[in-house]
Amino acid sequence: MDYSEVVGKLVSCPEECGMCCLCQPEVLPEERPFFKKNYPQFLVRTKGPNPYNALALKKGCGSCVFLENRRCKVYDHRTAYCRQYPYHLYASDRIKVELDLSCRGAWYGTGNDAVSESKALIKAAEPRIEQALSESKEVYREFFANCKEAGVYQDPSMLRMTVSENASMFADLGYLSRIMDMSTIEPIMAIAGIRPETNLDMASLEEAGRELAMDSMSSSDPLSVPVYCDKDWNWNMFMAANGRIEWSVMDDEGDLQHKAFANAENIKLKVPDADGRKVLIDYVNTLNQRDSFMGSVFSIMDMNGYEDDMTNSYFGSMAVTVMDLMWRMSMLDHFMGTGVGAEGVREAIIFYDMDRLDAPTIGAFV
């Protein structure tokens, strides 16, 4: 068990928020009898390739049907997945607790001790963890064997050490540009000693960041687009289509209220100022230690048929992740004036991190 991400953290659950209730929770077999007996009309099967039992959402796309005035009506019987938020238990060749930074309560430095809460959640999830860990260990063993056979294996701990030693590069547009180029050109790239790009092609960088961010917003289904809970506890949603972004707010009844449109090309890529850069570097270091981030890189390598060296895949993925985040920061500033300082970067992370944790991975969240 690895608790390093939550050591020293305090986490609260703001009463006005309710953002986690926009996520449709799975109902485990042992939880099903309560809902089947008392609320059978609110038990549903999800759509998709791997359907599961879940609680219904208001109008099929809003918050959970049990959320009323931002309070849960079945709080004492809420599902395991509701209880776990904002903690994510990731199974690889070990279990690592990761903290969802889209939860505003993770930023205030008040509330309950995160390690104590995590340990209680892990104890409650022991049967599921045992099975998930057994399966994920085998997946990782097979993945590493495939990497070695293809000649693309590198020591993950060394990759992490390199990023840790050079984290500031991933918060600098000149270095990001260079790293992204090298990751696609060099057989096995190295970032130690590289120099930043001095003649930046801003049009290409803006296009890269825009495409990354808009890809996640390209759905007309509110369940499939990023959600940003702002400081006033509004559930903001952004949908991209035909080169435009629509900003809407989901209300407590499950209806979308239109706020504004913007042509995506009119949103210019901005970079954090000195204070914002510090927050961004901290986030890079957080991602660098997450097993789920490493697992998402491994998933990309597997989908690409083990063509790229693990070094290029890892450094390149970190760089494009930051580009996505920077463009989202720029978009929030365009619509809401959040800025590019420490607060602006924090708001962008709050907007982004849940999607980051939802990225495909070879491991599993328990």
Cite the ranges covered by each PLM segment.
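Short loop/turn segments that flank or connect secondary-structure elements
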Residues: 1-19, 24-62, 66-71, 76-366
